[in-house]
Amino acid sequence: MHTAWQEILKEEKEKDYFIRLWDFVKTAYRETTVYPPKDRIFHAFDAVAPQDVRCVILGQDPYHGPNQANGLSFSVNDGVAIPPSLRNMYKELMSDLGCPAPTTGNLEAWSNQGVFLLNTSLTVEAGKAGSHAKKGWESFTDRVIEVLGQQEQPIVFILWGNHAKSKKSLIDTNRHLVLESVHPSPLSASRGFFGSRPYSQTNDWLQQQNRTPIDWCIS
């Protein structure tokens, strides 16, 4: 975790709920198979300090299949099949910006440019979607969203689906841009995700705010 995040979240990690959460997580890793790998739980916080975040893409759960989750929302490791929601994100990326088809599902290239890829739950038991929800992670990640929402520099928050949209109240919408649509999941993508142009909208707004746009194309 970047030192700036460590400092900001130090008090949060000392709260009773987080101590209980962390006890639960440690036990879960010991007794069951949990994703992502333990050293990747806070990977989203490694690459980018809060003051350098330009865009937040909010996910829900880590992937719950082998070798998929790497601590960044929607991202998978190199060499792993690109999951359906991410495939749809890429389809929209190609349509929106004319990017070539990405060959990897690894989104480190976005993270390294200040795209904060945050799940609202940071761990999950293998094969059991949502299994670590309501254990305390949401309180922790709500605090993270609040911290980002209080940053001086303007940030784009991308909220896909009802779960992500429910976090809008944590964000100062006078200072930041919130882009909302249905989730890129195959179940909903055709109902308003395709054609929503989140990538170009993000860059247009960042440039209006005198911030550097993001190179979204993934080679």
UniProtKB/Swiss-Prot annotation:
Family stated for the protein in its record: Belongs to the uracil-DNA glycosylase (UDG) superfamily. UNG family.
Annotated Gene3D superfamilies: Uracil-DNA glycosylase-like domain (3.40.470.10)
Entry-linked SUPFAM superfamilies: Uracil-DNA glycosylase-like
Annotated protein name in UniProt: Uracil-DNA glycosylase
CDD domains, A to Z: UDG-F1-like (cd10027)
Enzyme Commission (EC) number: 3.2.2.27
InterPro entries attached to this UniProt entry: UDG_fam1 (IPR002043), Uracil-DNA_glycosylase-like (IPR005122), Uracil-DNA_glycosylase-like_sf (IPR036895)
Catalytic function, reaction form: Hydrolyzes single-stranded DNA or mismatched double-stranded DNA and polynucleotides, releasing free uracil
The entry's keywords: Cytoplasm, DNA damage, DNA repair, Hydrolase
One GO term of the biological process aspect: base-excision repair, AP site formation via deaminated base removal
Subcellular location: Cytoplasm
One GO CC term on file: cytoplasm
A GO molecular-function descriptor: uracil DNA N-glycosylase activity
Top enzyme category: hydrolase
Catalytic center residues: 61
The organism's place on the tree of life at top rank: Bacteria
Task of the protein: Excises uracil residues from the DNA which can arise as a result of misincorporation of dUMP residues by DNA polymerase or due to deamination of cytosine.
